[in-house]
């Protein structure tokens, strides 16, 4: 008997750094292809998919502003443009394997992509298209995690998935500490007050206020995204 898929609409957040793969900068085509195939498996199972990608593989606003020459506001806008570059790359990868995809930007770039309109985004999803949201919230001082949470709420997602390099949430960095303990479930409050890095406090608070579950999972395990949505144990952690 086939497992029943519980969530019909999800938003998946990928970090820009993940797109760089083993490189320090840019886009690893192999990683891009892997992500595209994982997204395709969701679409083939009648799941409506929204995507947000960070821009850290190109530039981070906070880092750009550290030298004192570039103001933080300008640095953040530069970061927003980086997310649009990643969004267009992901669109190409998805369309290459046959998925109808739209990019919507919080900053108007009409020659490249649509401007973000939540009603239009929902209509695209209902038609089976993948929608990639670029340029963050369109405002400086907000992270792409916050942008992803905001878009997830606006389009009515059942949950937001933060796809990372680890299997879930740990009490400390599993890449540095062999005794790191995986936390399968924790509350919004625990995520806010603890030293556990899930998302920034603004994103978690927004999810809490709107009762949006946050899932953290490993993006590099083949089939893992689909398994997460089926609520199989052992492949993710959840904040709710």
Curated annotation (Swiss-Prot):
Q: Which GO terms describe its molecular function?
A: ATP binding; UMP kinase activity
- The record's principal subcellular location, in a coarse class, is cytoplasm
Q: Which reaction does it catalyse?
A: UMP + ATP = UDP + ADP
Q: For this protein, what is the EC number?
A: 2.7.4.22
- Which class of enzymes does this protein belong to? transferase
Q: How is its activity regulated?
A: Inhibited by UTP.
Which GO biological-process labels does this protein carry?
A: 'de novo' CTP biosynthetic process; UDP biosynthetic process
Q: Which residues bind ATP?
A: 13-16, 56, 60, 164, 170, 173
Pfam families in alphabetical order: AA_kinase
Annotated UMP binding lies at 55, 76, 137-144
Localization, UniProt: Cytoplasm
- Give me the Gene Ontology terms describing cellular component: cytosol
**What HAMAP family does the record tag this protein with?**
PyrH_B (MF_01220_B)
Q: Would you identify the family this protein belongs to, as annotated?
A: Belongs to the UMP kinase family.
The subunit field of the Swiss-Prot or TrEMBL record says: Homohexamer.
Q: What does this protein do?
A: Catalyzes the reversible phosphorylation of UMP to UDP.
Q: What is this protein called?
A: Uridylate kinase
Q: Which organism is it from?
A: Helicobacter pylori (strain ATCC 700392 / 26695) (Campylobacter pylori)
Source organism lineage? Answer: Bacteria, Pseudomonadati, Campylobacterota, Epsilonproteobacteria, Campylobacterales
